[in-house]
C-alpha cells in the first residue's frame, strides 16, 4: 500500500482489511471496454465465433500450436462465489451475457445461489457445484464439472478465502483457525492455479486466471489477523512466479493476473469493524459488493476481448480515489456513519 502510507494512520489499513492502493491511470492497462451493443452482436454470430472461438496462429505455446482467440460470451468460473464479492461478480458476468460456474463448500449456499441466479438469468447460463478448494480431488471435480457444462473456461477467478472470522493477536489464535486460513488462502489458491493452468494450456483458446489480493498483499503489517495478511502477501508472489513459469515453459495461451476489489462490505470485512479507527476507514473507503463488481467485470472482460496476454493488476480502490474520499471526509464530513456508527 505504498500510495496510502502518507495519509493512513499507523496500522489503519491493516485493522480494516484494506488491500493495496496505488494510483492508476487505467485499471486494465489501457484496455478498451466493448460496448453492450457490440457484445450482443458478437454473441449472436453463427459458426465458431458463437462459441467464442476464432482461430489465430501463435508461436510456441508449450506444445499448443494454435491459439483460438476469445470473443464474448465468455465462460467464467469463480471460487467462493455464493455470497459477497464472488456472488456479485457472478451476477455481473451473467448480466454481460456470459456463462458462469459458481462453487462453495456449502451445498445449501450453492443450491440457493444457483436457484436465485437461474431465476434472473435463465437455466442455461449458470451452474453450481460444492467444492472445497483445499482438496485437490474437489478442484479436479470442479474442472470436470465446468468442462461438462461449458466445454472451456476462459476466465477463472480465485476468490475463495477465509480469515476464520477471527480478529485477535497470533498468540491467541487457535491451531484450527490458523489451519483454516492458511489451507484455504494459500494451499487452496495453489491447487486452483495448478488445475486451471493444466486445463487452460490444453484449450485451443487458452485462458486467464485472476487471483484476488487482500490486506497484507503489499507487505504491510496486518495486526490482529497476521495469518491472513501473510497468506495474501503470498498471492502476489505466487502470481509473479506462475507468470515466470509460463514464460519459461513457452505457454503462450495462459496468463495469470491479480485482482484487487479494495474494501468490500462483506461479512469478512464487517467482522473486523470493532475499533473506532476501523469504523472510520470502513465508512470512508468501503463499497458494497455490487458496486465493486460493476467496475471490475468490464475491466476483466476487456483483457480477452483485446486479445491481451500481458499480466495485469486490476484495482478498484486506487490511491487517487482514496485520497479524494479522505479529503471529503475531513473537509465536509462525507460518509460519516455510512455503514457503521462511529459515535
UniProtKB/Swiss-Prot annotation:
Function summary: Required for chlorophyll b degradation.
Family classification: Belongs to the short-chain dehydrogenases/reductases (SDR) family.
Protein's organism: Oryza sativa subsp. japonica (Rice)
Residues annotated as catalytic: 228
Alphabetized Pfam families for the sequence: adh_short (PF00106)
Enzymatic class: oxidoreductase
Enzyme Commission number: 1.1.1.294
Catalytically driven reaction(s): 7(1)-hydroxychlorophyllide a + NAD(+) = chlorophyllide b + NADH + H(+); 7(1)-hydroxychlorophyllide a + NADP(+) = chlorophyllide b + NADPH + H(+)
Gene Ontology MF: a single term: chlorophyll(ide) b reductase activity
Transit peptide feature, positions: 1-54
Induction: Up-regulated by dark treatment.
GO biological process: chlorophyll catabolic process; PSII associated light-harvesting complex II catabolic process
Official protein name in the record: Chlorophyll(ide) b reductase NOL, chloroplastic
Annotated localization: Plastid, Chloroplast thylakoid membrane
